[in-house]
Amino acid sequence: VPNVSYTADPTWAGHMDLAMAERYQINHMWFAYNYFPTVSLGDASFETANDAKAYLNNNDVSVFKRLITQTTANTYMLVISHVQIPAIDNEHLASNSKAIITDWLRHELGYNGVVMTDRVDVGALQANQKIGDFVVNSIVAGSDLVLLDADTGHIDEVHRALTQAVANGTISNDRLNDAVKHILLMKMQTQLQQ
Protein backbone atom coordinates (compact mmCIF):
# COMPACT_ATOMS: atom_id res chain seq x y z
CA VAL A 1 0.00 0.00 0.00
CA PRO A 2 1.91 3.03 -1.25
CA ASN A 3 0.59 5.58 1.25
CA VAL A 4 1.92 3.62 4.26
CA SER A 5 4.73 1.63 2.62
CA TYR A 6 8.03 2.46 0.99
CA THR A 7 6.65 0.99 -2.22
CA ALA A 8 3.88 -1.23 -3.56
CA ASP A 9 6.53 -3.76 -4.67
CA PRO A 10 6.77 -6.42 -1.91
CA THR A 11 10.38 -7.33 -2.74
CA TRP A 12 11.60 -3.74 -2.62
CA ALA A 13 9.52 -3.04 0.52
CA GLY A 14 11.24 -5.98 2.21
CA HIS A 15 14.70 -4.65 1.28
CA MET A 16 13.85 -1.23 2.71
CA ASP A 17 12.31 -2.68 5.89
CA LEU A 18 15.36 -4.84 6.54
CA ALA A 19 17.71 -1.90 5.99
CA MET A 20 15.75 0.20 8.48
CA ALA A 21 15.64 -2.71 10.93
CA GLU A 22 19.41 -3.00 10.83
CA ARG A 23 19.80 0.67 11.77
CA TYR A 24 17.30 0.38 14.62
CA GLN A 25 19.05 -2.73 15.95
CA ILE A 26 22.50 -1.11 15.80
CA ASN A 27 21.09 1.73 17.91
CA HIS A 28 19.30 -0.65 20.33
CA MET A 29 15.87 0.68 19.47
CA TRP A 30 12.58 -1.18 19.41
CA PHE A 31 10.57 -0.84 16.24
CA ALA A 32 7.46 -2.21 14.60
CA TYR A 33 6.54 -3.49 11.20
CA ASN A 34 3.09 -2.27 10.10
CA TYR A 35 0.36 -3.56 9.26
CA PHE A 36 -0.24 -7.30 9.36
CA PRO A 37 -1.84 -8.84 7.35
CA THR A 38 -2.59 -5.79 5.18
CA VAL A 39 -3.98 -2.29 5.41
CA SER A 40 -6.70 -2.79 2.83
CA LEU A 41 -7.99 -5.44 0.51
CA GLY A 42 -9.25 -2.85 -1.96
CA ASP A 43 -11.80 -4.51 -4.23
CA ALA A 44 -10.56 -8.05 -3.59
CA SER A 45 -13.04 -10.60 -2.25
CA PHE A 46 -12.58 -14.27 -1.48
CA GLU A 47 -14.75 -17.36 -1.19
CA THR A 48 -12.61 -19.20 1.36
CA ALA A 49 -9.95 -18.55 3.97
CA ASN A 50 -7.48 -20.45 1.78
CA ASP A 51 -8.21 -18.11 -1.15
CA ALA A 52 -7.70 -15.04 1.04
CA LYS A 53 -4.48 -16.38 2.52
CA ALA A 54 -3.13 -17.40 -0.89
CA TYR A 55 -3.74 -13.89 -2.23
CA LEU A 56 -2.24 -12.17 0.83
CA ASN A 57 0.67 -14.63 1.08
CA ASN A 58 1.65 -13.64 -2.47
CA ASN A 59 1.31 -9.92 -1.74
CA ASP A 60 1.48 -8.07 1.58
CA VAL A 61 2.14 -11.10 3.77
CA SER A 62 5.11 -12.14 1.63
CA VAL A 63 6.96 -9.14 3.09
CA PHE A 64 6.10 -10.18 6.65
CA LYS A 65 7.26 -13.75 6.01
CA ARG A 66 10.62 -12.40 4.92
CA LEU A 67 10.87 -9.98 7.83
CA ILE A 68 10.00 -12.68 10.37
CA THR A 69 12.76 -14.96 9.09
CA GLN A 70 15.42 -12.30 8.42
CA THR A 71 15.05 -9.92 11.37
CA THR A 72 16.67 -10.82 14.69
CA ALA A 73 13.99 -12.35 16.90
CA ASN A 74 12.58 -10.29 19.77
CA THR A 75 13.93 -6.97 18.50
CA TYR A 76 10.71 -5.77 16.90
CA MET A 77 6.93 -5.85 17.08
CA LEU A 78 4.29 -6.51 14.46
CA VAL A 79 1.33 -4.14 14.35
CA ILE A 80 -2.01 -5.77 13.55
CA SER A 81 -4.34 -3.76 11.33
CA HIS A 82 -8.05 -3.26 11.79
CA VAL A 83 -8.86 -4.68 8.35
CA GLN A 84 -11.64 -7.23 8.13
CA ILE A 85 -11.15 -10.33 6.01
CA PRO A 86 -14.54 -12.09 6.05
CA ALA A 87 -13.22 -15.21 4.32
CA ILE A 88 -10.86 -15.77 7.27
CA ASP A 89 -12.96 -14.32 10.11
CA ASN A 90 -16.40 -13.02 9.33
CA GLU A 91 -17.01 -11.68 12.85
CA HIS A 92 -13.83 -9.83 13.81
CA LEU A 93 -11.37 -7.27 12.56
CA ALA A 94 -7.84 -8.66 12.19
CA SER A 95 -6.86 -6.94 15.46
CA ASN A 96 -9.54 -8.97 17.32
CA SER A 97 -9.20 -12.21 15.38
CA LYS A 98 -7.71 -15.34 16.92
CA ALA A 99 -7.83 -16.89 13.44
CA ILE A 100 -5.52 -14.16 12.13
CA ILE A 101 -3.26 -13.38 15.12
CA THR A 102 -2.83 -16.76 16.80
CA ASP A 103 -3.64 -19.31 14.12
CA TRP A 104 -2.15 -17.60 11.06
CA LEU A 105 0.55 -15.21 12.30
CA ARG A 106 1.85 -17.18 15.25
CA HIS A 107 1.20 -20.82 14.28
CA GLU A 108 1.35 -20.86 10.47
CA LEU A 109 3.97 -18.14 9.95
CA GLY A 110 5.93 -18.91 13.13
CA TYR A 111 6.04 -15.41 14.61
CA ASN A 112 6.78 -15.56 18.35
CA GLY A 113 7.39 -11.90 19.12
CA VAL A 114 5.32 -9.00 20.38
CA VAL A 115 2.04 -8.31 18.60
CA MET A 116 0.66 -4.81 19.03
CA THR A 117 -2.63 -3.38 17.85
CA ASP A 118 -3.07 -0.25 15.84
CA ARG A 119 -4.89 2.51 17.76
CA VAL A 120 -7.67 0.80 19.66
CA ASP A 121 -9.95 3.84 19.69
CA VAL A 122 -10.10 3.55 15.89
CA GLY A 123 -10.58 -0.23 15.97
CA ALA A 124 -13.32 -0.04 18.60
CA LEU A 125 -15.14 2.54 16.51
CA GLN A 126 -14.88 0.32 13.41
CA ALA A 127 -16.06 -2.73 15.37
CA ASN A 128 -18.83 -0.76 17.10
CA GLN A 129 -17.51 -1.79 20.53
CA LYS A 130 -16.49 -0.05 23.72
CA ILE A 131 -12.74 0.46 23.85
CA GLY A 132 -12.37 -1.74 26.93
CA ASP A 133 -14.23 -4.62 25.29
CA PHE A 134 -12.24 -4.22 22.09
CA VAL A 135 -8.92 -4.36 23.97
CA VAL A 136 -9.92 -7.44 25.96
CA ASN A 137 -10.97 -9.20 22.75
CA SER A 138 -7.65 -8.28 21.13
CA ILE A 139 -5.59 -9.65 24.03
CA VAL A 140 -7.65 -12.85 24.07
CA ALA A 141 -7.10 -13.17 20.29
CA GLY A 142 -3.31 -12.98 20.75
CA SER A 143 -2.19 -9.35 20.90
CA ASP A 144 0.35 -8.50 23.60
CA LEU A 145 0.22 -4.70 23.60
CA VAL A 146 -2.44 -2.20 22.63
CA LEU A 147 -1.85 1.22 21.14
CA LEU A 148 -3.90 3.89 22.91
CA ASP A 149 -4.43 7.54 22.23
CA ALA A 150 -3.63 10.05 25.00
CA ASP A 151 -7.24 10.29 26.23
CA THR A 152 -7.00 9.54 29.97
CA GLY A 153 -10.61 8.33 29.93
CA HIS A 154 -9.64 5.67 27.41
CA ILE A 155 -6.59 4.70 29.46
CA ASP A 156 -8.72 4.29 32.59
CA GLU A 157 -11.39 2.31 30.69
CA VAL A 158 -8.78 -0.05 29.23
CA HIS A 159 -7.11 -0.55 32.61
CA ARG A 160 -10.45 -1.39 34.26
CA ALA A 161 -11.47 -3.73 31.44
CA LEU A 162 -8.15 -5.62 31.44
CA THR A 163 -8.06 -5.90 35.24
CA GLN A 164 -11.62 -7.24 35.29
CA ALA A 165 -10.97 -9.64 32.38
CA VAL A 166 -7.97 -11.15 34.19
CA ALA A 167 -9.90 -11.36 37.48
CA ASN A 168 -12.91 -13.11 35.91
CA GLY A 169 -10.83 -15.43 33.70
CA THR A 170 -11.77 -13.93 30.32
CA ILE A 171 -8.03 -13.40 29.83
CA SER A 172 -6.45 -16.62 31.06
CA ASN A 173 -3.28 -16.68 33.11
CA ASP A 174 -1.62 -18.57 30.25
CA ARG A 175 -2.53 -15.83 27.75
CA LEU A 176 -1.40 -13.10 30.16
CA ASN A 177 1.89 -14.90 30.87
CA ASP A 178 2.44 -15.43 27.14
CA ALA A 179 2.00 -11.70 26.47
CA VAL A 180 4.35 -10.77 29.31
CA LYS A 181 6.90 -13.33 28.06
CA HIS A 182 6.89 -11.80 24.56
CA ILE A 183 7.46 -8.32 25.99
CA LEU A 184 10.20 -9.43 28.41
CA LEU A 185 12.02 -11.39 25.69
CA MET A 186 12.11 -8.25 23.55
CA LYS A 187 13.41 -6.23 26.48
CA MET A 188 16.07 -8.84 27.27
CA GLN A 189 17.17 -9.12 23.63
CA THR A 190 17.65 -5.35 23.46
CA GLN A 191 19.74 -5.40 26.65
CA LEU A 192 21.87 -8.27 25.31
CA GLN A 193 22.73 -6.22 22.23
CA GLN A 194 24.05 -3.30 24.27
Outline where the language-model segments fall.
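Mid-to-C-terminal alpha-helical segments outside catalytic/metal-binding sites
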Residues: 161-164, 170-193
